[in-house]
Every structure is written in structure tokens, then in C-alpha cells.
Regions:
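Active-site acidic carboxylates
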Residues: 1-115
Length: 117
């Protein structure tokens, strides 16, 4: 089974009030950009308004985090995964990036910078 084509949807324009009253402490925070690889975003189709909005917002969050000294980390699946390494992923999502290694890169606007991890 592979990931199906996914539908676009509107990003929220307003956020609900926070449930807690604490503030973010930049010295104890990190930003994780998870699986923003071309392989995954492609399931929303070319020129997806959702992916464009998401990428723009994530780029703004990353910029603010860097200004505050918050480290940025990325997850990204490798292009060559053995069936043993993929394990349950094969059962759920098929062969993944093994079929499309050219799509391994993180989307251009969010590619890791030299000081990212």
C-alpha cells in the first residue's frame, strides 16, 4: 500500500487560546521540522496551496527560532532503506523513498542551513 493522493485543506487562520499560561523558554526549546521532504509533500499535488502555506509558515517559525537562539532539527527518511529497517512502514505505506530517491530532499524553502542539525 502506498500513500494515497491527499486533499488540500485550509490552514487555520486563528488559533484557540492556549490551555496553559506558561511561556516558551528559548533556552529549553527546539524546533523539529518533521518529514518535510519532497516525497511527502508531492502527495498533495503540484502547486499545492496547503504545502505553499505550510512551507511559508514553517519558514517564518524557523526564522524566529533562529533569532531566539532555538536550535532547529530535521527528520528525513533515507532514500535507501532495507526491508528490515522499514519493517512496519512497508506494510503500512509501501516501499517509500526507495521508489523515488530523487524526492529525498527537504523542500527548497526549508532545506537545512549549516547551523541546523
Amino acid at each position: 500500500m502506498a500513500i494515497p493522493t491527499l486533499n488540500n485543506y485550509a490552514m487555520p487562520s486563528q488559533w484557540k487560546a492556549n490551555k496553559v499560561n506558561w511561556s516558551l523558554d528559548p533556552k529549553r526549546a527546539a524546533l523539529l521540522i518533521h518529514d518535510m521532504q519532497e516525497y511527502f509533500t508531492a502527495f498533495y499535488g503540484e502547486n499545492s496551496p496547503l504545502i505553499a502555506a505550510l512551507t511559508e509558515q514553517l519558514a517564518a517559525v524557523r526564522k524566529q527560532c533562529k533569532a531566539l537562539g532555538i536550535p532547529v532539527f530535521y527528520t528525513a527518511q533515507p532514500k535507501d532503506q532495507s526491508p528490515e529497517d522499514r519493517a512496519l512502514l512497508n506494510d503500512m505505506w509501501g516501499s517509500g523513498l526507495n521508489k523515488s530517491p530523487e524526492l529525498q530532499q527537504v523542500v527548497a524553502a526549508l532545506r537545512p542551513e549549516p547551523d541546523d542539525t
